[in-house]
């Protein structure tokens, strides 16, 4: 049997312990799973509201992608992506680094150019960015790390009723304090770092895919957020080098089976060649 602690010393020890625990958790910090999820959702909603309120924006991202080649070998690809958005119906993105691609969406059609391969593809597209992003995923299985933040409501794209996880803690990057959030949903786990004060715009994300046969992990760093960029009108007009070959955008078989013939046969929008 241990020697009992004198009453006065015991009170002092308990007080010190309580104080240290309080400081470790921080005032008002979530302590339960439900509180952590609620805090995480609150921060995502705040970030979403900021982007929703911006009719135009531009951002540059650096991506480190862990991919699986058709041979089954692992490959790490590093990309830089510059994105320009004008809601509700204009989008442009250029990718450099391990690949060199451009995408234009002008409210009528979508044009994809693969510069390394010297080919381009076109397809008619719905009338809004939101519907076009949905169509790209459903028809072609295409999605990018920036896609969720381009939607009218990023929170609705990122969070579902099945989402678990939430607030992890606060971290410092340089002189900036960030809220670190981690979530899990069907087939995916993802983390995001958002400034605690100032504009709540994403600074970094890490996404891991459990069942994706092509991409296992994407680490994305955001920089140069601009919520009031000056965008030339021709930014959203596709231009393709004259010697590039046009190819078809192959849709998922299940979509083609259920698509009306007239929709599947719709001609692509016109494109200007340099």
Map each language-model feature to its residues.
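N-terminal mature ectodomain segment of secretory-pathway/periplasmic proteins
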Residues: 35-119, 182, 187
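Flexible, processing/modification-adjacent segments and terminal tails
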Residues: 30-31, 35-43, 71, 112-177, ...
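Bacterial N-terminal signal peptides that target proteins for export
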Residues: 2-14
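C-terminal motif of bacterial Sec signal peptides marking the signal peptidase cleavage site
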Residues: 22-24
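Bacterial signal peptide processing site
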Residues: 26-28
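Secretory-pathway-linked proteins and extracytosolic
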Residues: 250, 255-264
């Amino acid at each position: 049997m241990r020697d009992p602690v004198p009453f006065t010393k015991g009170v002092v020890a308990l007080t010190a312990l309580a104080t240290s625990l309080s400081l470790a958790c921080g005032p008002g910090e979530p302590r339960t799973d439900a509180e952590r999820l609620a805090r995480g959702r609150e921060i995502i909603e705040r970030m979403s509201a900021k982007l929703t309120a911006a009719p135009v924006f531009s951002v540059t991202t650096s991506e480190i992608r862990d991919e699986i080649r058709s041979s089954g070998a692992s490959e790490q690809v590093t990309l830089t992506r510059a994105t320009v958005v004008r809601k509700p119906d204009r989008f442009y993105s250029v990718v450099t680094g391990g690949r060199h691609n451009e995408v234009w969406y002008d409210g009528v059609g979508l044009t994809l150019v693969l510069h390394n391969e010297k080919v381009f593809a076109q397809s008619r597209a719905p009338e809004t960015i939101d519907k076009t992003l949905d169509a790209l995923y459903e028809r072609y299985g295409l999605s990018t790390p920036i896609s969720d933040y381009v939607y009218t409501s990023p929170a609705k794209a990122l969070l579902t009723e099945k989402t678990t996880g939430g607030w992890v803690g606060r971290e410092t990057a340089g002189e900036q304090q960030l809220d670190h959030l981690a979530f899990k949903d069907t087939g995916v786990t993802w983390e995001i770092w958002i400034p605690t004060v100032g504009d709540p715009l994403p600074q970094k994300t890490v996404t891991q895919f459990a069942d994706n046969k092509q991409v296992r992990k994407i680490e994305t760093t955001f920089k140069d957020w601009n919520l009031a960029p000056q965008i030339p009108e021709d930014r959203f007009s596709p231009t393709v080098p004259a010697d590039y070959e046009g190819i078809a955008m192959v849709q998922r078989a299940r979509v083609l089976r259920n698509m009306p013939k007239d929709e599947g046969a719709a001609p692509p929008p016109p494109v200007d060649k340099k």
